[in-house]
Each structure stands twice: as structure tokens, then as C-alpha cells.
Amino acid sequence: MIFWLLLAVFICVKDVAATFTPTNGAALKAAVAACLKETPSDGSCPLFAASNSNGMLGEWKTDAVKDMSDVFYKSDSFNGDVSHWNVAAATNMNGMFDGATRFNSDISKWSLSRVTNMHYLFHDANSFNADISSWNVGHVTSLDGMFFQASVFNSDISKWDTSSVNSMDRTFFQAFMFNADVSKWNTAAVNSMQTTFYEAEAFNADLSKWQISAVTDLQFTFGRATRFNGDISKWSIGKVTAINR
């Protein structure tokens, strides 16, 4: 009887337009936590959706949310569909999928033109290798730890506009499979590359044209990146004050 009741509720929810419209990050995070408590893997949460007239997680209207930091933090079973979320207003995605160890869903069409902070966005998202090649990251100032321990990530990000980025600490730290082309990244504004490729064991891509004249910290940039043997002889390191190897 309980099974059929839940099934009926689920069917009804699918037929009802999503109405949940969070206005801030706190409201979104609270709703995500409640939904995933019921159905951790996909966010269908039929009881939560019906009782609050919210609809399923993937259908929520996130148009007004600016702060998406930690929304799926440690959601280690989640791999639901959030491809239809409107994230155009978002400015902060710090740790959004940090610890979401199974997440690998399609977010290729997200509009990120206002995002400035991608700290630890996919930290420890060790299943993530989805297509994010067309993301607009032109206003992002920090890529610190973005793919830290994203151990299988190796997708194409060659066309990203990184001209506003000023910090790349731990960006690919322990991104063990990463060896994608980042040769054309604009790094002219970057001032710190501490442990950027630390233990990125597969990495050996061309970085010869990177502009690092503003960088002051190169501590362990290629520490334990055992395959890296690229030509960086023309790098301008005049401002570097820390360069442990």
C-alpha cells in the first residue's frame, strides 16, 4: 500500500509544474538538503516535492540565486539532472560540487557569465568528466582548487577565457588523469600558481606560451607531476619570490 501511495505521489509530482523559486543561496541549500535526504541519488524526492508544492529538484527555478556555494557539498550519492537550472544570476560557486563524488551530469549549457568565484567547485568530485568546454568564465578571478582531486577529469577546457583569473593555487592538484590542452589560456593576470599541477601525474601539455610575469609564488607548481617535461624556459619569473620544487 505504501509503495503504491508513493508511486501515485511521484506521478502527480511529475505532472505538476515546479513552483519552488529560491531567492537566495541559503534557501536553495536548505531545499537541496531536504530533497536529497529523501532521494540522495537523483533529487526526485516525491514526498518533499508534493508536500511543499516544490516539484522535483531538477525543475526548480534558480533564476534569482547569486550564491550557489556548497549547494551539493558532500552530496556523495548525487548524480541528478540539473541541466535546466538557470544559473545566470550566480556570482559565487565556491565548493558547489565539493565532495559530490558521483556527480557527472550534463551542465554544459549553464550560463556563468557573472560568476567570479570557482574555488573548489569540483574538489573531490572524483567521477566528474562532463563537457564544460563552452562555459563562459571570463569574469572568474579565482580557480583555486577547482579540480583539486577531481581524479578522472580530462575534458576540453582549451577555449576558456581566463584573462580575469588572478589565482590558480591547487587548480589541478591531484587531478591524476588531466592532460588536456590549456596552452592558450591567458595567465597574464595570475599572481599565484602554488601547487597548480601538484601530483597531476598524467600532465605533460604545452605551457610554453603562458605569461607568468605577474606571478610571485611558484611553490611546488609541478611537484610530483612525474610526467611533466614541457619547455618553460622562456617563462618570465622576475617577480617570483617563492619557487620550491
Which residues make up each language-model segment?
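Negatively charged
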Residues: W4-R245
